[in-house]
């Protein structure tokens, strides 16, 4: 079955979540996130926010991230340390399987992802989730 999405229309349905933090409860996130289509073992997800996401990782596969509007800094924690990537509208990144990552978008971002499930989130403000969970 083919799924066709009008990305502009889908993003217009979302409201901008301002002041997002890693600890933002689901009630704050309501209306700023959508899962418009399934994809393989996960889904296509859309988000519209300004602030800082929770750290997350995907143990079963890579995540494809595309910035549709705005900008974000994508932080990845690797064996070499913390890496940062500045992403603006029209750019994408592939986050490797099981890699902790976080989005920081002080001025706001509209992002679409192809995300495998399950996703592990760490909803506390830490510099490195590995020190809390893996170490």
Give the ranges of each region predicted by the language model.
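Short histidine-centered beta-strand/loop micro-motifs
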Residues: 35-38, 54-59, 76-77, 84-86, ...
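Short acidic-glycine-tyrosine-enriched beta hairpin
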Residues: 78-97
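Short, conserved beta-strand element in jelly-roll/cupin
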Residues: 48-50, 58-78, 114
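Short beta-turn/strand-loop junction motif enriched in small, turn-promoting residues
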Residues: 51-54, 98-100
